[in-house]
Amino acid sequence: MAKTVAYFYDPDVGNFHYGTGHPMKPHRLSLTHSLVLHYGLYKKMIVFKPYQASQHDMCRFHSEDYIDFLQRVSPNNMQGFTKSLNAFNVGDDCPVFPGLFEFCSRYTGASLQGATLLNNKNCDIAINWAGGLHHAKKFEASGFCYVNDIVIGILELLKYHPRVLYIDIDIHHGDGVQEAFYLTDRVMTVSFHKYGNYFFPGTGDMYEVGAESGRYYCLNVPLRDGIDDQSYRHLFQPVIKQVIDFYQPTCIVLQCGADSLGCDRLGCFNLSIRGHGECVQYVKSFNIPLLVLGGGGYTVRNVARCWTYETSLLVDETISEELPYSEYFEYFAPDFTLHPDVSTRIENQNSRQYLDQIRQTVFESLKMLNHAPSVQIHDVPSDILNYERTDEPDPEERGGEDNYSRPEASNEFYDGDHDNDKESDVEI
């Protein structure tokens, strides 16, 4: 039976800009959406311009002081916030930029709305490529992430779902999500990531397994440089099958960070776009309600290819290898294809022996789980999106609902190997 797929896209979200030289480029979302449109994939989905999350929504996970700071700080007044900037880890990796709070509101609102639609059985799969910012902590920003839309989305899912499984295939450990649910068996977190050699964020060892009620409900799969499709598949599929068999989640959240692809500007893995997509296809095959989110990914043209391809898999549509003509067509030079060779010369340091050892350790850990922990019956709170908004300024003062619209920053288009945002790699 065909699945109902909800797709969230805010036309302004790609116009925010972290600043000159910063590797995180929201413009990748505009490129992705352009390909989704020109391939005609939007016809297979219900397309939403998402809800914008309020302070109240964000404070379901984050501290009020931190969210209040995000709403008030701007490039013009940040000199007066020196103490707060340090306290909340806002600075180099997580800079203050124009429209910062609104950017967070847009990507978080989409994840929250996706969770609500899944709760109400209005869709089987919800996609928010702008979300997946898995490093943000309760009291601070981290790793280009300010508000943890994943945690907020999962908290909404937990109103209706006794058990939520979180899977993370970003090259970086999903530390913010793990930390949020470390003490509970209501959420099981499974992260496949590069670990060792001081690679950010430095967490995600195999022996981080959860604590108290959450003991053994946290699973980490630490990987070494250069992992390829075959090696990744050798671990991913059996681990996920075992987790789903044991835990029996009623909903899955999948973070699809594309920095695990070969040729990523900040990555050191060797996955192809097909190999990355195979993970998405495999998780989808279990026919469990699914919230699909973006995440990392710093070679912009390949991020757009990857998430477009994965959108096609989620809607069961075969799309052409030749990219459709769009306003960003020249950006995909020189091959203009969906699946260019993204392999690198990085040696695969994940030997079969190492992978088997990890697999064995993971399976031993799973044996410690209670099968499908149950939840006491409780009243279901009203949907978060029905809450009365008391923290919004008057629309007249704001200048209308869509007051913040910025032109595309030209340096969003730069992402070459030696890119420093001073010279474009592509003629636009």
Curated annotation (Swiss-Prot):
Keyword flag Zinc: yes
Enzyme Commission number, as recorded: 3.5.1.98, 3.5.1.-
GO biological processes: circadian regulation of gene expression; epigenetic regulation of gene expression; negative regulation of transcription by RNA polymerase II; regulation of circadian rhythm
Main location, first listed in the record: nucleus
Basic and acidic residues: bias regions: 386-405, 415-428
Catalytic residues of the enzyme: 135
Binding residues for Zn(2+): 170, 172, 259
Alphabetical keyword list: Biological rhythms, Chromatin regulator, Chromosome, Cytoplasm, Hydrolase, Metal-binding, Nucleus, Repressor, Transcription, Transcription regulation, Zinc
Keyword Cytoplasm: yes
Location of this chain's protein in the cell: Nucleus; Chromosome; Cytoplasm, Cytosol
CDD domains for the chain: HDAC3 (cd10005)
One term under GO cellular component: cytosol
Region (Histone deacetylase): 3-316
Family: Belongs to the histone deacetylase family. HD type 1 subfamily.
Protein name, per record: Histone deacetylase 3
Protein's organism: Xenopus laevis (African clawed frog)
Gene designation: hdac3
